[in-house]
Amino acid sequence: MSARQIYYSDKYFDEDFEYRHVMLPKDIAKMVPKNHLMSEAEWRSIGVQQSHGWIHYMKHEPEPHILLFRRKVTGQ
């Protein structure tokens, strides 16, 4: 498994959340569960590295190698 091949998008925002998507290489994408969204422990175990607080909130069914994450925007 090569975590170096994982692509992390820039963050994008709305009023409530910041978002990012993560694109996995095919060998790692095979390890993504098909029946549920992943917990932080699960996505870390397949090599995804990002700061704490990100939630795997949606699947993009046509492209299961793309993981969609969000986290609550905190007041400044």
UniProtKB/Swiss-Prot annotation:
Binds to the catalytic subunit of the cyclin dependent kinases and is essential for their biological function. The keyword Thylakoid does not apply. This is Cyclin-dependent kinases regulatory subunit. Keywords: Cell cycle, Cell division. PANTHER family: CYCLIN-DEPENDENT KINASES REGULATORY SUBUNIT/60S RIBOSOME SUBUNIT BIOGENESIS PROTEIN NIP7. Belongs to the CKS family. Forms a homohexamer that can probably bind six kinase subunits. It holds the Pfam family CKS. One of its GO terms (biological process) is cell division. It comes from Patella vulgata (Common limpet). The keyword Cell division applies. GO terms for molecular function: cyclin-dependent protein serine/threonine kinase regulator activity. Signal peptide: none annotated.
